[in-house]
Amino acid sequence: MSKLTQNWNRRRFLGAMGGAAGLLILKDARSARSYQANEKLRVAAVGIGGMGAWNLAHIAGENVEFLPTRMLIKPATQPVMTGENIVALCDVDDRTTATSAPDRRNPPGETFARYPQAKRYFDYRRMLEEMDDQIDAVVVSTPDHLHAPISLAAMRRGKHVYCEKPGAHSVMEGRLMGQVAAEKGVATQLGTQIHASENYRRVVELLRGGAIGAVEECHIWPRGAGIAPSERPKETPPVPAALHWEQFLGPTRYRPYHPVYSRGCGGNWQRWWDFGNGNLGNMGGHFFNLAFWALELRHPLSVETEGPPPHPETTPAQLHVRYKFPARGSLPPVTLTWTHGSEPPRIFAENKFPDWAWGVFRGTEGMLLVNYDRWMLWPERKFAKFVAPAPSIPPSIGLEITRRAEWIAAYRALLPGQGLAEFGHRMEWIAACKTGSPTACNFGYSGAIMETINLGAAAYRAGTRLDWDAANLRVTNAPQANALLSRPYRPGWGM
């Protein structure tokens, strides 16, 4: 395999895990260590620009005003939250300015300066080795190709992990994330922050309560196309002094530096297969999460895709993915579709849904339109006299922590239905680290979402429908596609 090592093919994976029967562990892991009521977690963070800086600000109780794509106004009376102890920061980039929109308000260099007490690293492996006995928990906010390697390395050392979505860059990585979290007894949370929102809870209650009858379909259309495919650049400009290119590449195959791969340099790593899975990998975690929760989905039976011919280097600008899920107890089989690009799915094209709706659940008695912060029963006339049931799903533990008048007044007015959820989701993880309380998006639950997203990408790249044997982690109808379930790792970066 030239210079690459295939560390986790299916046979070795199943062998290391003791066979397939023990893989589906759904319970949330309990904290491996007990904490005094006022004791601070010792937190390390890997990936501290962009969303990483925002994750840190919440966990450390920092009074900052930025968020990628949004600005928040800090209330004058804002209390410091639990204010965890930030002991180590790791990023491959320490520039103090950035050229792309997502990172321009919080480049890594500024985050390093914001926490001067934290020890600084550029290689997460060295950080975990040198500070093993000084770190309790790790926050991972890197490009997608590093999510699982860092999270797994931390969990194997007994560290609690909060990882941004999607959490895995291959099907096998998604399975392994849930398995190792359960084996090590650590608290985990995938960064699908909207799971903590009141709106998602109301949608789950409506669907499980039979508001639209038996749900047979869910269609997701986040609108917006990806970037048109392109070839790998031939130019090899010098690596910026502030960028550690080898550490940026991490486990993925070597390629010379070019700014198109680095968001901090004005590029977009998400569109390159070696670093991400495009729109599906970027946003699928948020959108699939609601369907998995409400409909009790786990593993699809099959997946097929439609789109332009697969490009070997870059992800597609348009893509349609169709998953078939089996019946679950009394719940009927479900078709789940994902579409990104300018052409809407048929159900959106045939109905005059409001522009805010990115998802629709179709049941035997009607439809339910959804977004992060609202829902609507459809057709409106049929449900004009519908009265929603009283809330029955308790608020997120973390959301309860943040329910203080100062926060509610400042953030709920600015980001209806979202501001508090973002805080609550992270505080839920903090509570789990300290007390062993459950997290809603622990890797036992969210690992199946990671697998499903990556299986869709594999089906597209394989160019054929995949019939999926989840218990044995294999494609049954197209054996050649099994090579796409894992990825090669460079020596020294394997899992």
Placement of each model-derived feature along the sequence:
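Extracellular/periplasmic catalytic domains that process cell-envelope and extracellular macromolecules
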Residues: 36-38, 79-82, 113, 131-133, ...
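Contiguous beta-strand/loop segments that form the cofactor/metal-binding neighborhood of enzyme cores
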Residues: 202, 213-444, 450-495
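Alpha-helical packing segments of well-folded alpha/beta enzyme cores
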Residues: 55, 96, 150, 173, ...
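Short, solvent-exposed turn/loop segments enriched in Gly/Ser/Thr/Pro and often Arg
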Residues: 93-96, 121, 141-147, 167-169, ...
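Structural recognition of the beta-strand scaffold that forms the well-ordered cores
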Residues: 43-45, 87-90, 139-140, 162-163, ...
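A contiguous active-site-proximal alpha/beta segment in oxidoreductase catalytic domains
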Residues: 160-162, 167-250
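N-terminal glycine-/serine-/threonine-rich beta1-alpha1-beta2 phosphate-ribose binding loop
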Residues: 2-159, 172-187
